């Protein structure tokens, strides 16, 4: 009996070793996350390893970048300093700026799922005093073809409530009926501020509460927090504007300015956390498959849909964020399985060199099967 047991154990060991060798031949090995615990699994893929460094190091990159294939990190590149004393890490968090809009869109669709909102609802149902509100739908706010526009406002002080922000929007936003009628697209962040105000109105909760409940708790995100959080729990980077002569100027926006970015750019996230969240929105894990398609899938020749642009050759979704010394980029397949995520805490004045490198890399990486 013992002889058979030993033989069986020996066969199992042989199978395990053989499987491990096959994995090595394929170039994929699991990486331990004991030092830098990330939201998604990391593996070493010899085919992809080094691509990010080769491309981004030429830009004097300061930040964190990851390549995703089959929902796993297959390459990463970290460079530069997060603060005056700390280096950037894979778990460092960065202000994601406009990359937050796709997340706000997800919060809107979550309320549609709950029956509290319809994409066809007119805005005057919630904010009757907003110019043009009786002509604009929730869907048009999401896709930025509402006919609304608003110049960038300057704020002082350390506090700004949602009610005060809404008053500023109502007093300063402009509605162009001809633009609305033509369906012309115009990038106007105020659309997402209005959506965020509507979310707070219909739920009785703050935007932050909705974000925490829908995303952070559900997906167990550990490296995600708001810019105005008093108790900073993540390895947060400072944002620097880099001048042509190389001088770095640390950015420190006042509290009112941070609060004015409601739903459009007030969240800090690590690159792995951000990928996990956006992929979970696109693949239906958070919203359901049908709702995710209805919200995000581009229609016809439309380039912008609920916070994401569309690249056609090859086909993938993307977004860019700039502000307060940060520059962020995401390029992701529609099913969320492949992605390029690049977060930097160096915003170089008058230079889009980092974006060009990200685009070049993404076209190759996302363009093959």
Where are these regions (language model features)?
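Catalytic loop of the DD-peptidase/beta-lactamase superfamily, centered on the K-T-G motif
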Residues: 2-6, 14-69, 73-77, 256-369
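Short active-site loop at a secondary-structure junction
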Residues: 59-61, 85-140, 178-187, 262-265, ...
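Short alpha-helical hairpin
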Residues: 68-83, 159-168, 246
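Solvent-exposed coil/turn segments that connect beta secondary-structure elements
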Residues: 70-72, 84, 146-147, 231, ...
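Hydrophobic (often cysteine-bearing) scaffold residues that line and stabilize catalytic clefts
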Residues: 96, 100, 104, 191, ...
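Short, surface-exposed loop or secondary-structure junction motifs
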Residues: 136-316, 320-322
């Amino acid at each position: 009996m013992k002889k058979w047991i030993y033989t069986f154990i020996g066969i199992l060991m042989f199978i395990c070793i053989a499987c491990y060798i096959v994995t090595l031949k394929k170039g994929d090995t699991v990486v331990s996350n004991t030092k830098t615990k990330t939201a998604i699994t990391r593996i070493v893929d010899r085919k992809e390893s080094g691509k990010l460094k080769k491309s981004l190091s030429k830009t004097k990159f300061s930040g964190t970048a990851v390549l995703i294939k089959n929902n796993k990190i297959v390459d990463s590149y970290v460079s530069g300093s997060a603060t005056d004393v700390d280096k950037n890490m894979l778990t460092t968090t960065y202000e994601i700026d406009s990359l937050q809009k796709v997340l706000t869109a997800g919060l809107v669709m979550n309320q549609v799922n709950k029956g509290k909102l319809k994409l066809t609802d007119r805005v005057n149902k919630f904010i009757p005093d907003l110019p043009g509100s009786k002509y604009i739908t929730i869907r048009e706010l999401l896709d930025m073809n509402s006919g609304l526009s608003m110049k960038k406002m300057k704020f002082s002080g350390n506090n700004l409530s949602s009610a005060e922000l809404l008053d500023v929007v109502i007093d300063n936003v402009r509605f162009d009926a001809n633009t609305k009628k033509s369906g012309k697209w115009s990038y106007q962040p105020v659309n997402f501020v209005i959506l965020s105000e509507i979310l707070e109105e219909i739920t009785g909760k703050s935007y932050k509460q909705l974000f925490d409940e829908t995303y952070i708790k559900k997906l167990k995100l550990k490296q995600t927090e708001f810019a105005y959080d008093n108790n900073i729990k993540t390895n947060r980077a400072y944002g620097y504007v880099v001048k042509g002569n190389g001088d770095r100027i640390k950015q420190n926006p006042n509290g009112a300015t941070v609060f004015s970015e409601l739903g459009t750019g007030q969240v800090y996230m690590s690159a792995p956390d951000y990928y996990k969240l956006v992929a979970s929105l696109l693949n239906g894990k958070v919203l359901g498959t049908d709702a995710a398609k209805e919200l995000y899938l581009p229609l016809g020749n439309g380039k912008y849909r609920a916070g994401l642009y569309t690249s056609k050759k090859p086909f993938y979704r993307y977004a860019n964020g700039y502000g307060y010394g940060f520059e962020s980029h995401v390029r992701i397949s529609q099913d969320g399985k492949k992605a390029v995520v690049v977060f930097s805490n160096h915003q170089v004045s008058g230079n889009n060199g980092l974006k060009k490198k990200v685009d070049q890399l993404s076209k190759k990486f996302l363009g093959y099967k």
